[in-house]
Amino acid sequence: MDIFDAIVLGIIQGLTEFLPVSSSGHLELGKAILGDTSLPEESLLFTVVLHFATALSTLVVFRKDVFEIFSGLLKFKWNEETQFSLKIIISMLPAVIVGLLFEEQLEALFGGNILFVGFMLLITALLLWLADKAKDTGKKVSYRNAFIIGVSQAIAMLPGISRSGATISTSVLLGNDKTKAARFSFLMVVPLIFGKIAKDLMSGELMASSTDFSILATGFIAAFLAGLVACTWMISLVKKSKLSWFAIYCFVVGLAAIIFAYAQ
C-alpha cells in the first residue's frame, strides 16, 4: 500500500461511514468487479486507524452535544443527559449481541454474494425514500424507539444495508424528528467503534502489522477530514429531506449488482 492508496481508502472510509450507501456492500461489489487481488491489502492496524479517525470526526462535529452529555452525567442526577446515555446503551445491545455471536456466520453466508448485496441495496433505497417523504416532527427518541433503532443497526451488519441509512430511516419512520434522528444515529455508533477498536487491540493481532507510519498518518488524516465533511453534510441533507438522492443511487447500484450477478 502506498500514500495514494491510503488517501483513497481514508476518503472512502470517511464518506461511507456517514453517507447512507453501505460501505460493506460497495466493498463486496468492488471485490467482485476487480477481484480480491486487485484491491490494496489493508492491514488490521490500518483499518483500526481509519475507524478511529471517523469516530473522532463524529466527536468533533457533535462536540457540544458530547460535552453536555458528559457534564450532565457528572452531576449524577436523573437528567436529560443521563436518559440520552441510557438510550444509547439500549440501542447498542442488538448490534453487540449479533456481532459477538453471529459476525463470522454472517460473513460466511453472505460475503461475496453479489445478488444478495443487490437486493439489500434495494431495501436501503426503499427505506431512504420512505424516510425522505416522512413529515418532520419535534418528537425525541424514546427508550422503545432506541431499541428498535438498535435492531436496525444490527440488521445493517448485512452487506448492502447501510448502517446510517437504516438507523436514520427507522428513527424517522417511528415518528422522530429528522435532525434528532441523525444526531442519535451518529452518536450511537461511536461507543461501538471504540469497543471494536479495543477488541482488536486486545487480540494482539495489531502487533504483527508492518504498516508504515506515514501510511497510517495519511489514512488517518484523509478519513478524519472526509468524515467531518460527510457527517456535517449528512445532517444538512436529512434536515432538507434530501435522502431521496441516496435512495436513487442505492436503487441504481442495487439493480446493477443484480444484473451483474445474473450475467456471471
From Swiss-Prot:
Top-tier EC class: hydrolase
Catalytic activity reported: di-trans,octa-cis-undecaprenyl diphosphate + H2O = di-trans,octa-cis-undecaprenyl phosphate + phosphate + H(+)
Subcellular location: Cell membrane
TM annotation in the entry: 42-62, 82-102, 109-129, 146-166, 184-204, 215-235, 243-263
GO function term, MF aspect, one: undecaprenyl-diphosphatase activity
Biological process according to GO: cell wall organization; peptidoglycan biosynthetic process; regulation of cell shape; response to antibiotic
Coiled coil: none
InterPro entries, alphabetized: UppP
Signal peptide annotation: none
Keyword line: Antibiotic resistance, Cell membrane, Cell shape, Cell wall biogenesis/degradation, Hydrolase, Membrane, Peptidoglycan synthesis, Transmembrane, Transmembrane helix
GO CC aspect terms: plasma membrane
EC number: 3.6.1.27
UniProt function note: Catalyzes the dephosphorylation of undecaprenyl diphosphate (UPP). Confers resistance to bacitracin.
PANTHER family in UniProt: UNDECAPRENYL-DIPHOSPHATASE
Stored HAMAP family: Undec_diphosphatase
General remark: Bacitracin is thought to be involved in the inhibition of peptidoglycan synthesis by sequestering undecaprenyl diphosphate, thereby reducing the pool of lipid carrier available.
The protein, known as: Undecaprenyl-diphosphatase
